[in-house]
């Protein structure tokens, strides 16, 4: 058994996540950074097949971030793989890019799934990973994976992705309840498209344009409020210390504030929320 990095990450997640940006985000010249030499030891690979983005991250044996690749693609809808061959080809592309950067082949990976997804669909995720050339030996519920990074003891982790909102309630460091509902960033785009007359693809671009987000906030606020309502419904009377929002949708300004207003529970968004879950998926693969 090797050292599990998330124990350190959970104690100081912001410090650990500050290093993630260096290996996942592109350099100003548009080229992703490569390693000076191939890493030694086993690698931990996490694959997150999202409704909006597919993300692949690579960690070393101790859990240090080495490389990450991501791309927008609608190969999954509400947690279900709807374009198998598209998902496989996309993952192969991300895998090839990561392999070139680290100088080693990726032969195995862990992947995640939204809570409540039918078992057959969970297996479909495994099939995508293996068709892309990696053995998939571990699957983990996405909000549980996120807490591998966050290390929350008593609270709620909410993974607001493109199509679904996944919830994990933690007590004494253990997940005691999980749930998933079909609300996420895609619904932001649908609302924006309906209000502006834009196509869905145009609304997606507008949603992610920083200079436009303040003006779009009144349109998407009801969706944010729905996320808060979903959380309250699944808490079922429990009183967690905090709510932590992860997933790409959590990047939209005002998300944490609206959820806190609806729930009355302190709510935060950590650094790089889109990468929390795939990093946790990789960290979950601790049988290297």
Explain the meaning of each model-derived region.
Residues 163:
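Short glycine-rich anion-binding loops that position phosphate/pyrophosphate groups of nucleotides
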Residues 171:
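A cytosolic small-molecule/anion-sensing beta-strand core signal
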Residues 166-168:
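A structural feature that tracks compact, well-ordered secondary-structure segments
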């Amino acid at each position: 058994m090797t050292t599990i990095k998330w124990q350190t990450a959970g104690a100081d997640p912001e410090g650990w996540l500050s290093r993630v940006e260096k290996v996942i985000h592109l350099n100003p010249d548009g080229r992703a950074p490569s390693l000076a030499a191939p890493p030694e030891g086993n690698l931990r690979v996490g694959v997150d097949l999202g409704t909006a983005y597919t993300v692949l991250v690579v960690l070393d044996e101790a859990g240090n971030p080495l490389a990450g690749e991501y791309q927008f693609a609608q190969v999954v809808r509400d947690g279900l793989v709807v374009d198998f061959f598209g998902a496989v080809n996309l993952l192969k592309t991300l895998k090839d890019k990561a392999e070139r950067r680290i100088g080693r082949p990726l032969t195995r990976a862990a992947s995640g799934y939204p809570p409540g997804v039918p078992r057959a669909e969970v297996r479909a995720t495994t099939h995508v990973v293996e068709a892309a050339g990696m053995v998939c030996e571990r699957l983990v519920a996405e909000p549980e994976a996120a807490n591998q990074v966050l290390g929350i003891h008593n609270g709620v982790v909410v993974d607001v992705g493109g199509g679904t909102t996944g919830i994990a309630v933690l007590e004494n460091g253990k997940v005691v309840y999980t749930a998933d509902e079909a609300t996420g960033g895609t619904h932001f785009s649908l609302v924006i498209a309906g209000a502006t007359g834009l196509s869905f693809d145009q609304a997606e671009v507008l949603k992610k344009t920083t200079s436009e987000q303040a003006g779009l906030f009144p349109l998407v606020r009801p969706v944010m409020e729905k996320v808060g309502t979903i959380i309250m419904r699944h808490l079922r009377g429990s009183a967690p210390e905090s709510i932590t929002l992860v997933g790409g949708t959590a990047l939209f300004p005002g998300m944490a504030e609206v959820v806190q207003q609806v729930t009355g529970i302190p709510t935060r968004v950590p650094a790089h929320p889109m990468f929390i879950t795939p990093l946790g998926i990789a960290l979950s693969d601790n049988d290297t």
